[in-house]
Swiss-Prot record:
It comes from Escherichia coli (strain SE11). The lineage of its organism: Bacteria, Pseudomonadati, Pseudomonadota, Gammaproteobacteria, Enterobacterales. It comes from the Bacteria. This is Regulatory protein RecX. Modulates RecA activity. The gene is recX. Belongs to the RecX family. The keyword Cytoplasm applies.
Length: 166
């Protein structure tokens, strides 16, 4: 950090840091708070910003007010991103909970997203195990464990086998 930067008020330094963090990708409010509170790596090692709790609150409020920080937008984008990577609804819910998103906001976004979880689970199975799907019990159990680990619900997993039999 340069000498002129260290003389800037803590609020201005925090705001600059928040905008830089949010310019890379969307964050939840809790993630942003955690990153702002973490020490900055400077040329001479970690450096703390001497900011008050009021400075942090003002920065968060400014980010909300100017559209840089929006938990509902973050949740929608996070769900879309993780589902494209093949993760199921249970895992996505758990990850959002870890990021400080309320259960109500998560459930609202999950209802609003237009994702066919059963089709997504089937795509994951065919990508990993190929067509046709195995009929041997031990292979079915292996696939079930894989999908449960990826965060799919048991009803979606069972639908794969029901639809496969048709």
């Amino acid at each position: 950090m340069t000498e002129s930067t260290s003389r800037r008020p803590a609020y201005a330094r925090l705001l600059d840091r928040a905008v830089r963090i949010l310019a890379v990708r969307d964050h939840s409010e809790q993630e942003l708070r955690r990153k702002l509170a973490a020490p900055i790596m400077g040329k001479n090692g970690p450096e703390e910003i001497d900011a008050t709790a009021e400075d942090y609150e003002r920065v968060i409020a400014w980010c909300h007010e100017h559209g840089y920080l929006d938990d509902s937008r973050f949740v929608a984008r996070f769900i879309a991103s993780r589902s494209r990577k093949g993760y199921g609804p249970a895992r996505i819910r758990q990850e959002l909970n870890q990021k400080g998103i309320s259960r109500e906001a998560t459930e609202k976004a999950m209802r609003e997203c237009d994702i066919d979880w059963c089709a997504l689970a089937r795509d994951q199975v065919t990508r990993k195990y190929g067509e046709p799907l195995p009929t041997v019990f031990s292979e079915k159990v292996k696939i079930q464990r894989f999908l449960l680990y990826r965060g799919y619900l048991m009803e979606d997993i069972q639908d794969i086998w029901r639809n496969f039999a048709d």
